[in-house]
């Protein structure tokens, strides 16, 4: 309300720990309850806030997450009669959680939804604190609410852009660039180009295992020795590798059930890079 001068009302229809199946447009009890609330209150809604998915981090549901979320979005819009915006959040973490691959699939699906479904936005949450093994602290929820308000203000009211950085290109750093930015060590560096970087990346640790990135090729995992960022080249990150990587590989970022606690973030928004899983790269 402070940003627009207009009061903001929320219609609460969520339930903690609910899987996507309960939002199934055909017979999901939570979906039907949401429709009841919509019809009871009437009026036109500005958007849907969506933070869900932990209960779908199992084999089967994880693989179908994007498909089922798309069905939910399309059914909701059909019911309302207009393309209501969706403001979504990638999953945070579960301390000592299992099914790493499934967490990676769901986070990746949440990123793809924002890319593939018109009117869907996404925020990253992997640097927010927890009060137990899986739930955000009260402070983290306040911070998340402020981030959502900024993104809603951008989408709905044309305010300043507020999006997490997003990886758009991976290539080998050439000799001139390695020399210019003093990328020494093994001499094997990847250059990552990102969109939506306000100023530059804040990298809390230069150690590769703390970077949040995982790289694999046909020979297995490629150890990441170090990560670098710099102000002169604000929308880039550099990864130093322990060995040469094949021309075709897969890169993942903050994908496990309990990934790194302090991934690289935008220095202005403090939003981590958008998580992704097994992104195919050709060098």
Where are these regions (language model features)?
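Cell-envelope and extracellular/periplasmic
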Residues: 1-283
